[in-house]
Amino acid sequence: MSVDANKVKFFFGKNCTGESFEYNKGETVRFNNGDKWNDKFMSCLVGSNVRCNIWEHNEIDTPTPGKFQELAQGSTNNDLTSINGLSKFQVLPGAFQWAVDVKIVNKVNSTAGSYEMTITPYQVDKVACKDGDDFVQLPIPKLTPPDSEIVSHLTVRQTHTPYDYVVNGSVYFKYSPTTGQVTVIKKDETFPKNMTVTQDDNTSFIFNLNSEK
């Protein structure tokens, strides 16, 4: 039994048996109540170049978060039932510990693809997405201490002439290694005044562009 170095293979049965499904590095997958695969994965193989974070729930749990687990690179996980039903997971590059999932929503006009948002965490490669795109995964390395805030440069640029930047600021993210929850921190002096942020689940954030100024 094996899996590609850059993938995770989940199984319906314990001990890596039964029907299986593979997911690639950079994917964040969440199942909702009633979905075919919600709470169905019972074991998995993690490729040698990736790690995998798994959650019992995919929502922001209040007041008590569901169960959470970090699965190591190259690991064989024969019994995932301790998670009480897997509803969400992230397949991360092996050198990273956690990730934020981000998207931009255009509230300025009705034309999809009008703006491109770029987020660049400190000493980490940037990710970019356009309004109308789905969430993109932004992996973060292990910090010291692990629940430190990480500052990220945030820009939004028009994708049409004159290609002006309409946002230039920063946002902070903070991770809980106990629950796997990510929180966003907006500092008044640096967070763009023409944007708001909505948390969509335990790692996912929607950045709303409300105006160009």
Swiss-Prot record:
GO terms, biological process: aggregation involved in sorocarp development; biological process involved in interaction with symbiont; calcium-dependent cell-cell adhesion via plasma membrane cell adhesion molecules; defense response to Gram-negative bacterium; heterophilic cell-cell adhesion via plasma membrane cell adhesion molecules; regulation of gene expression; response to curcumin; sorocarp development
Primary subcellular site in the record, as a coarse category: membrane
Record bears the keyword Transferase: no
Sequence repeat spans: 1-48, 49-97, 98-146, 147-194
Record key words, sorted: Calcium, Cell adhesion, Cell membrane, Membrane, Repeat
Region (4 X approximate tandem repeats): 1-194
Induction statement: Expression is controlled by rpkA.
MF terms (GO), sorted A to Z: calcium ion binding; calmodulin binding; identical protein binding
The keyword Repeat is annotated on this UniProt entry: yes
Post-translational modification: The N-terminus is blocked.
Cellular component per GO, a single term: phagocytic vesicle
Localization: Cell membrane
Free-text note on domains in this protein's UniProt record: Cell binding activity is dependent on the N-terminal segment whereas the C-terminal domain tethers the protein to the cell membrane.
PANTHER family found in the cross-reference section: CALCIUM-DEPENDENT CELL ADHESION MOLECULE 1-RELATED
Annotated function: Mediates calcium-dependent cell-cell adhesion during the early stage of development.
Family: Belongs to the Dictyostelium CAD family.
Protein name: Calcium-dependent cell adhesion molecule 1
Protein source organism: Dictyostelium discoideum
Designated gene of the protein: cadA
